[in-house]
């Protein structure tokens, strides 16, 4: 029995090294076999499925393995077997105690940089352009409770808006539930180990994502800002005729803003929600106030967010 366990342990250690031997080309060869099998199985039960192939989303770095550096060499072998491309990105510098400005700047700039790199990679390889699914995104920033903060909520809205603007087919935040780890926690909800916070309590990012989606129209439309580097605007229109604008203040101070509309008729009334952090934990408040309403706990947001009336 002891010898059996040792053999299993040795086998597992060998398995740990497998990614070093996998190449992009071999992945593509396996991928095509997998797609054929899955498509055949789906057809047999009268279903249509869509399968994505994984790309490396950014230029190679010196510290990366040769597998990662050469991964996108899979494209010629892949051909046209896939329905979309899959990428992941955690935006900020790995394992760094990033400040709020660094976190927000990453959300503001990385989606466009990443899309440019992907499209150039496809063009260079002569590969077909297909939808890009950002199936995992979040931040590496840690050490100051960045991941569970109000700033993480602003980061989330920026990532989603930039994903829309840069025509990603999908942008899925990682993840719903994780582990507290003193605030280095990607979870959208508390896992129950956060002191004084019950399991499934929404984090600030949840509220930002909820209200961004609630107010978002059917079509993304152009928006620009003059005389301010602090405000980032995103606008959308509804098929019913109304329009929406999301204004993100990236500075530490309040900013007075005037909104002007082009090519749209202005209605008689407008409605809005205002989200902001509280005065706890410096740049990374664990609380979010929505139209002045906040949590009764040490973290999170207002319990009645779904029935909270807008300002008007």
Description of each model-found segment:
Residues 1, 54-58, 87-91, 135-138, ...:
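Active-site-proximal beta-strand/loop segments in catalytic clefts of secreted hydrolases
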Residues 7, 12, 20-159, 166:
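Noncatalytic carbohydrate-binding groove/subsite architecture in carbohydrate-active enzymes
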Residues 72-74, 120-122, 158-161, 170, ...:
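Generic recognition of flexible, low-complexity loop/linker segments
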Residues 134-241:
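Aromatic/acidic polysaccharide-binding cleft in carbohydrate-active enzymes
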Residues 145, 256-259, 282-289:
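Short conserved micro-motifs at the rims of enzyme active sites and ligand-binding pockets
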Residues 228-268, 272-279, 312:
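Carbohydrate-binding surface patches
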Residues 264-311:
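Acidic, Ser/Thr/Pro-rich beta/coil linker or hinge segments at domain junctions
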């Amino acid at each position: 029995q002891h010898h059996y366990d040792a053999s299993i342990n040795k086998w597992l250690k060998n398995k740990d090294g497998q990614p070093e031997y996998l190449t992009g080309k071999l992945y593509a060869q396996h991928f095509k076999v997998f797609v054929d099998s899955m498509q055949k199985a789906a057809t047999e039960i009268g279903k249509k499925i869509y399968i994505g192939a994984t790309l490396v989303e950014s230029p190679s770095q010196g510290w990366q393995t040769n597998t990662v550096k050469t991964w996108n060499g899979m494209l010629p072998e892949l051909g046209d077997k896939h329905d979309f491309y899959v990428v992941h990105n955690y935006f900020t510098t790995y394992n760094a105690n990033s400040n709020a400005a660094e976190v927000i700047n990453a959300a503001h700039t990385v989606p466009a940089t990443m899309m440019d790199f992907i499209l150039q990679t496809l063009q260079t390889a002569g590969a077909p352009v297909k939808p890009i699914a950002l199936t995992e995104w979040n931040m590496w920033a840690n050490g100051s409770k960045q991941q569970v903060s109000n700033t993480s909520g602003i980061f989330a809205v920026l990532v989603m808006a930039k994903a829309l603007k840069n025509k990603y087919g999908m942008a899925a935040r990682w993840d719903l539930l994780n582990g507290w780890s003193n605030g280095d926690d990607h979870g959208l909800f508390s896992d129950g180990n956060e002191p004084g916070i019950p399991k499934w309590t929404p984090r600030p990012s949840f509220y930002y994502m909820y209200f961004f989606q609630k107010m978002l129209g059917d079509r993304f439309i152009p928006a620009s800002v003059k005389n301010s580097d602090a405000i980032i605007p995103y606008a959308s229109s509804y098929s019913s005729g109304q329009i929406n604008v999301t204004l993100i203040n990236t500075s530490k101070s309040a900013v007075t803003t005037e909104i002007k509309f082009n090519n749209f008729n202005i209605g008689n009334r407008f409605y809005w929600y205002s989200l902001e952090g509280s005065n706890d934990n410096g740049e990374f408040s664990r609380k979010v106030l929505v139209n002045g309403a906040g949590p009764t706990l040490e973290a999170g947001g207002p319990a009645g967010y779904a029935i909270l009336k807008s300002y008007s």
